[in-house]
Curated annotation (Swiss-Prot):
Pathway: Lipid metabolism; fatty acid biosynthesis. NCBIfam families: acyl_carrier, PRK00982.1-2, PRK00982.1-4. Keywords: Cytoplasm, Fatty acid biosynthesis, Fatty acid metabolism, Lipid biosynthesis, Lipid metabolism, Phosphopantetheine, Phosphoprotein. It comes from Campylobacter jejuni subsp. doylei (strain ATCC BAA-1458 / RM4099 / 269.97). The gene is acpP. This is Acyl carrier protein. GO terms for molecular function: acyl binding; acyl carrier activity; phosphopantetheine binding. GO terms for cellular component: cytosol; membrane.
């Protein structure tokens, strides 16, 4: 769950929300209140944190926090 903890910290910081509000099942836009600009900035912050590249075509599919965690875990394999 280390990836989740790191993702949670980045999401909380980028969206200026309490980290406790970020759950695996949280939808980034609907549940956490992100807008399209927030999502772009969030993806950039995740790329920097995890030293990965997330193409726009993949970023569109990252709806829930769980999607982000699984995506990053797969990249790190």
């Amino acid at each position: 769950m280390a990836t989740f903890d790191d993702v949670k910290a980045v999401v909380a910081e980028q969206l200026s929300i309490d980290a406790d509000a970020v759950k695996m099942e949280s939808k980034i836009i609907e549940d956490l209140g992100a807008d399209s600009l927030d999502v772009v900035e969030l993806i950039m912050a995740l790329e920097e944190k995890f030293e990965v590249e997330i193409p726009d075509s993949d970023a569109e599919k990252l709806i829930k926090i769980e999607d982000v965690v699984n995506y990053i875990d797969n990249l790190k394999k």
